[in-house]
Structures are given as C-alpha cells and as structure tokens.
C-alpha cells in the first residue's frame, strides 16, 4: 500500500487515525511535530479534522515521493536520513533497484555501508550527479563493492542510470537516493520523458 496510517489518542485530537500519502516510516513523526506546532499556535481554532484531510492529501516533495508508478525519490543525503530510508523500504516486496549518488562533502562511505548492511536490492546503480560537488561514480561503485556482493553498475550519467533502472526493473520498485541534487535531476528527467511522450 502507498500510505501510512497511524493513530494518536489525546484530549485534543480525540482517538484519531491519521493517514499519510507516503511510505516513509519517518513521516508520522514529522506529521505529529507539525500537528503539535499547529495546536500550539492555533489552539481550539486549529480544526484538527481539517488537518486530517490535509495530511492525507499532502505530498512531501523528494521524501519517498513516488514520481512514476513504483519509482521513488528520497532526498536522503546524510546518515540519519539513510537510516530512516532503510527502515522505510518494505521488506515484504518482491525486489527493487537502488540508484545512488552523493556529493563529496558527505559521509557517503557510511551511507553506502548502511544501505548494504540493511537492504538486499536486486542491483545497485551508482551514478555521478552533474555538479562540481558530485563524487566520482567509479569511486562510489568501488565503495559499494567493498560492502556488498549484490550487482553494482556504475553509470556516469544520471539519465543512463535512470534508463537502465527502468529497463531492468520488470515489476520491481526503484529507489533513487543519496543526494538532493540526484532527486532533482531524476524528477527533471521524468518531467522531460513525460513531456516528450
């Protein structure tokens, strides 16, 4: 399913089940933080029932965002975000491909280690984001190979990485992460493909 339901019971919210249009398991905490800020700022005038619908329809750009059926981008670009990402990938699904890139000034080796330790994708596809800060794809690929025995493909262009993932996936999901730049580039490429279609 492509949503998360969670509940909270309090004098303010009553016994309410909330639903988020997102599969990121870290999003209920973010939603509750926003709800508490709303309660603090607006008190009884906040209308929690209206916010329930807002949360159900809300989409967080770049946070486990489904950009094509079965294709997700997540801006996870640090260790805590990658940890949250690994906990959000459904363990009961058939298979998936991970597309990854990172910038040079991030702790990408720890991020790669965490991905490889916690996930078992069909394949990792590593690429280079087209920015001076982008880490070399071959370097990232060699780090992945230190931590996993899963197939690792190194493709220099984000477009080639995405097209390869789409061609290889069959009915499997694709998750793209490691950099906000990568998230933006993937979304841009998908927009181009949709415009050209």
Predicted regions located by residue number:
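Active-site catalytic pocket residues across diverse enzymes, especially alpha/beta-hydrolases
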Residues: 41-42, 89, 119, 144, ...
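Short glycine-/acidic-enriched loop or helix-start segments at secondary-structure transitions
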Residues: 82-83, 108-110, 136-137, 185-188
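Glycine-rich beta-strand-to-loop/alpha-helix junction loops that act as flexible
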Residues: 100-102, 129, 177-180
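Glycine/aspartate-rich loop-and-adjacent alpha/beta segment that forms the canonical ThDP
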Residues: 179-197
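Extended acidic/charged loop-beta regions that coordinate divalent cations
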Residues: 1-17
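Short SAM/SAH-binding signature in class I
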Residues: 33, 169-178, 182
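C-terminal helical cap/extension that packs against the catalytic core
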Residues: 2-4, 70, 112-173
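Nucleotide phosphate-binding/pyrophosphate-handling subdomain across enzymes
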Residues: 12-123
């Amino acid at each position: 399913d492509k949503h998360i339901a969670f509940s909270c019971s309090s004098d303010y919210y009553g016994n309410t089940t909330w639903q988020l249009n997102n599969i990121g398991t870290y999003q209920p905490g973010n939603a509750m933080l926003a709800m508490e800020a709303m309660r603090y700022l607006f008190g009884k005038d906040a209308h929690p029932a209206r916010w329930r619908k807002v949360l159900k329809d809300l989409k967080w750009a770049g946070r486990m965002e489904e950009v094509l059926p079965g294709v997700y981008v997540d801006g996870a670009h640090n260790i805590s975000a990658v940890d949250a990402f690994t906990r959000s990938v459904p363990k009961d699904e058939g298979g998936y491909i991970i597309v990854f890139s990172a910038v040079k000034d991030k702790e990408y080796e720890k991020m790669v280690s965490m991905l490889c330790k916690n996930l078992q994708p069909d394949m990792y596809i590593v690429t280079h984001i087209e920015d001076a800060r982008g880490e070399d794809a071959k370097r990232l690929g060699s780090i992945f190979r230190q931590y996993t025995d899963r197939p690792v493909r190194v493709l220099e262009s984000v477009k080639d990485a995405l097209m390869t993932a789409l061609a290889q996936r069959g009915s499997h999901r694709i998750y793209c992460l490691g950099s906000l730049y990568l998230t933006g580039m993937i979304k841009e490429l998908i927009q181009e493909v949709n415009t050209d279609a």
